[in-house]
Amino acid sequence: EEYRLPMITPMQMYRTLGVEHDYLAVMAANSHGLTGVENNLYIANPNLKVFGVTMLELVKAIETGKPQEEIIKQFDFHSLFHYFESTEIEAVVLGCTHFPYVKTELEQLSRIPIIDVGVYMIDRLKSHIQEENS
């Protein structure tokens, strides 16, 4: 049996996000990851404003299994998200596969949407399939 599914990648999703927004914060593990995300965002929207943050130490804290609440305090995300709000960032993109570990805790700090690109990609794929079946 053959399925007609589109081929999609996280990098394509960054391009979609670039079109949908004017100002994003991107949290990545390191500068290489951030550069890849930024390049794809800017391909889609050269006028996009991006506030990039690299946090390899966050990856290490997550890998130790430290509780989410402790991580939020250790990295003072309350202050970071206060800054995001004050500069009118529209959404925060989790540009590392480790970071969804603290997503629920981050969502409690602010009303700024937190985008897990993996979930965003699945939602886009589901939407595409529903459109084809209509």
Where are these regions (language model features)?
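Non-catalytic structural scaffold of enzyme domains
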Residues: 1-134
